[in-house]
Amino acid sequence: MKGLRAFVPLLLSFGIAVSVSAQDASSTTAPTTAATTTASTATTSAGAAQGSSGEEESDAELAKKLNNPVSDLVSVPFQFNWENGINSPDRTRFILNIQPVMPFKLNEDWNLIARIVAPILSQPPRFVDGIGTSGVGDPLVSFFFSPAMGKIIWGVGPAISLPSTNDPTLGSQKWAAGPTFVALRQASGWTVGALVNQIWSFAGPPDRPSVNQMFLQPFVAYTTANLWTYTINSETTANWEDDSPNRWNTPVNFMASKLATFGTFPASYLFGWGYFFASPDDAFGATWKVRGAVTILLPKKKK
């Protein structure tokens, strides 16, 4: 039953996405990056506001780029996740994801965006009377080649999982790689899109299970004139090597974030809650989670 429910949030997210895209089909927008893209104009009325120096990107431009996984904005998010109900209502797993985004301009037409997700985990034991584990998980490094302009923002490239953990319960201990793709549209304050990757293991200890895993993240976000952003997304993982009851992990997240500048230091602050419509039936499946995040921004100077 959990496996079947994995499709519910995906259909919901894509249904909202199609509806919003249809409403905005008559307007135009330029791309941004990061998992979003960059634009020459702001998407909300807040675009008229400029930075204090007049040389930095405006707050509205920064807020727009934060919604774009492939924008030209250098950022360092620190994402804190508390996942509850790990095989028992009172068991919690903590995950800190450090997710730097580094864009590179290849030429006037193309950008290269490097995104890293480096997890640090602390989780309860598989069995209630065991000992928990803490440490570094396997980082995922993604590279997106993205056109600098276009109404539809997109990027494509390779994703590589690095076997950096020394604890078998915190990672696969396998080298894995595959394609990744992101596409989105931004207009009138809305950002609608999806990010997907599929990786397969190709090296590592032979006694460890093979990796054959898909990640799918549809997202819908709306940014207001006062720079509040409200987002709903799904972060679905499908482990194709596992049996059906343990294959799907499908949290749906509801989040609010605010861009704020203290002096000349811009940052985004986020809080959210998520519910797992599907999760593995084994000892590490969660029921719900709380998320907090701080994203440090390094805006580029205007020429």
Question: Which stretches of residues belong to each language-model region?
Answer:
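Transmembrane beta-barrel domains of Gram-negative outer membranes and organellar outer membranes
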Residues: 24-303
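Bacterial N-terminal signal peptides
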Residues: 7-17
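N-terminal secretory signal peptides that target proteins for export/translocation
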Residues: 1-5
